Amino acid sequence: MQYPVDTHTHTVASSHAYSTIHDYLAVAKQKGVRLFATTDHGPAMADAPHFWHFVNLRVLPRMVDGVGILRGIEANIKNRDGEIDYFGDYLSQLDIVLAGFHEPVFAPSDKVTHTEAMINTIRSGKVDIITHPGNPAYPIDIEAVVTAAAQYGVALEINNSSFEVSRKGSEANCTAIAKAAKALGATLVMGSDSHVAFSLGGFDRALSIIDAVDYPKDKLLNRSPMALLDFLTLRGHQTVADFIPHFRDEAI
């Protein structure tokens, strides 16, 4: 089954990625992906796009040939206080805000520090999805993080790329996160973390985790465009109302 939503992609605006928006649209049409988010790295990363890149995402069309393009960012968690590298009114102009740990911005430390930073990010109200929380370089108190995510309505990502090209050793942590999410009622989302368009909508390894723990598919944000749009609306992103006329008649 091809899930029709991908919340985590990178373009050539992040110089270690290799595809354009046009490339992603072409692959989306081929694979049946109906809605994807462009989420290049936040400006604190050395090769990330300039701040203005995110401000000017407003020039992107909402829909192209039946495919929706969400304007987003994968921000960097900067410190123990859970601060990220994108701020103020500019956040309200984005459709979706992801954030996670990245070594060039937040050096790996200890479990207590990582847990506090992640929970403070969740509590901040600025971030919709925590990316690759199962990264073994950043051990966390899984139960505490998942409890906070459930309480504050923030989704946790099962990152497909973590099992294929980066963050080796993530499988055990991601399985534990998925089990805890099922038990505690937290929302999960699969992210391709695509750095080349061919990977768009690629969730095979992440889905194997979801299936292994029998996580309820009706809580998985990838299940339909409206599932994600309803989630983002509840998170306060009024901008996503632009998409609803295009998808509201589809099953959630």
From Swiss-Prot:
<dbReference type="InterPro" id="IPR023710">
    <property type="entry name" value="Phosphatase_YcdX_put"/>
</dbReference>
<feature type="binding site">
    <location>
        <position position="74"/>
    </location>
    <ligand>
        <name>Zn(2+) 1</name>
    </ligand>
</feature>
<feature type="binding site">
    <location>
        <position position="10"/>
    </location>
    <ligand>
        <name>Zn(2+) 1</name>
    </ligand>
</feature>
<feature type="binding site">
    <location>
        <position position="102"/>
    </location>
    <ligand>
        <name>Zn(2+) 3</name>
    </ligand>
</feature>
<dbReference type="InterPro" id="IPR003141">
    <property type="entry name" value="Pol/His_phosphatase_N"/>
</dbReference>
<feature type="binding site">
    <location>
        <position position="8"/>
    </location>
    <ligand>
        <name>Zn(2+) 1</name>
    </ligand>
</feature>
<dbReference type="GO" id="GO:0008270">
    <property type="term" value="F:zinc ion binding"/>
</dbReference>
<comment type="similarity">
    <text>Belongs to the PHP family.</text>
</comment>
<protein>
    <recommendedName>
        <fullName>Probable phosphatase SO_1652</fullName>
        <ecNumber>3.1.3.-</ecNumber>
    </recommendedName>
</protein>
<dbReference type="Pfam" id="PF02811">
    <property type="entry name" value="PHP"/>
</dbReference>
<dbReference type="GO" id="GO:0042578">
    <property type="term" value="F:phosphoric ester hydrolase activity"/>
</dbReference>
<dbReference type="GO" id="GO:0071978">
    <property type="term" value="P:bacterial-type flagellum-dependent swarming motility"/>
</dbReference>
<feature type="binding site">
    <location>
        <position position="16"/>
    </location>
    <ligand>
        <name>Zn(2+) 2</name>
    </ligand>
</feature>
<keyword id="KW-0479">Metal-binding</keyword>
<feature type="binding site">
    <location>
        <position position="193"/>
    </location>
    <ligand>
        <name>Zn(2+) 1</name>
    </ligand>
</feature>
<dbReference type="InterPro" id="IPR004013">
    <property type="entry name" value="PHP_dom"/>
</dbReference>
<dbReference type="GO" id="GO:0016791">
    <property type="term" value="F:phosphatase activity"/>
</dbReference>
<dbReference type="InterPro" id="IPR050243">
    <property type="entry name" value="PHP_phosphatase"/>
</dbReference>
<dbReference type="InterPro" id="IPR016195">
    <property type="entry name" value="Pol/histidinol_Pase-like"/>
</dbReference>
<dbReference type="GO" id="GO:0005829">
    <property type="term" value="C:cytosol"/>
</dbReference>
<feature type="binding site">
    <location>
        <position position="41"/>
    </location>
    <ligand>
        <name>Zn(2+) 2</name>
    </ligand>
</feature>
<feature type="binding site">
    <location>
        <position position="132"/>
    </location>
    <ligand>
        <name>Zn(2+) 3</name>
    </ligand>
</feature>
<keyword id="KW-0378">Hydrolase</keyword>
<feature type="binding site">
    <location>
        <position position="74"/>
    </location>
    <ligand>
        <name>Zn(2+) 3</name>
    </ligand>
</feature>
<keyword id="KW-0862">Zinc</keyword>
<feature type="binding site">
    <location>
        <position position="195"/>
    </location>
    <ligand>
        <name>Zn(2+) 2</name>
    </ligand>
</feature>
